[in-house]
Structure formats: structure tokens, C-alpha cells
Curated annotation (Swiss-Prot):
The lineage of its organism: Eukaryota, Viridiplantae, Streptophyta, Embryophyta, Tracheophyta. The chain crosses the membrane at residues 14-30. PROSITE patterns: CYTOCHROME_B559. This is Cytochrome b559 subunit beta. It is a single-pass membrane protein. The gene is psbF. Its cofactor is heme b. The keyword NAD does not apply. Keywords: Chloroplast, Electron transport, Heme, Iron, Membrane, Metal-binding, Photosynthesis, Photosystem II, Plastid, Thylakoid, Transmembrane, Transmembrane helix, Transport. It holds the Pfam family Cytochrom_B559. Heme binds at H18. HAMAP family: PSII_PsbF. GO terms for molecular function: electron transfer activity; heme binding; iron ion binding. It comes from Arabidopsis thaliana (Mouse-ear cress).
């Protein structure tokens, strides 16, 4: 019966993980792109 309390936490945690993962992937992608452009 704790679905109402667990679901919002899971949603916030899911949004936080994606919110941190997307900028990290784009940041690593830009670094790798700069490395390939320099070489």
C-alpha cells in the first residue's frame, strides 16, 4: 500500500538521473568531438 509514497520518489529519482545523464553525455560528446577535430 506504499505505492503512493514510492512512485513520486521513483519519478523524481528517474528525472534526476536523466537530468544528470543527458548533460554528461553531451559534455563527453563535445570533448570527444574536440579531440577528433584537433587531431
Amino acid at each position: 500500500m506504499t505505492i503512493d509514497r514510492t512512485y513520486p520518489i521513483f519519478t523524481v529519482r528517474w528525472l534526476a538521473v536523466h537530468g544528470l545523464a543527458v548533460p554528461t553525455v553531451s559534455f563527453l560528446g563535445s570533448i570527444s568531438a574536440m579531440q577528433f577535430i584537433q587531431r
